[in-house]
Amino acid sequence: MSYADSSRNAVLTNGGRTLRAECRNADGNWVTSELDLDTCIGNPNGFLGWGMQNFSHSSEDIKLEEGGRKLTCRPKTVDGGFRERQGIDLNRIQNVNGRLVFQ
């Protein structure tokens, strides 16, 4: 299940690099969890992609939108400019018993 369906109070920390949310665990309790998005999202020439790394090193104005379901930013291109705002659906981030996990 997408983390957004079983979590609350999602925010970005560390300059947009870290997703933090309160996630419901199997016992029904709310547990604070964090996921370093630089371990699973990259920026290949101005577009965000899964299964890559370090998007935050080459992006600016990183935000959560749509109630935490989407991450947007202005990624840098190989020529050094910044592309218009790009987004990636965070549906690959799951809440696994109170932990944010990339799947």
UniProtKB/Swiss-Prot annotation:
One of its GO terms (molecular function) is carbohydrate binding. The keyword NADP does not apply. Pfam families: CVNH. Keywords: Lectin. Induction: Down-regulated by nitrogen starvation. It comes from the Eukaryota. Transmembrane segments: none annotated. Gene3D superfamilies: Cyanovirin-N. Mannose-binding lectin. Belongs to the cyanovirin-N family. This is Cyanovirin-N homolog. It comes from Tuber borchii (White truffle).
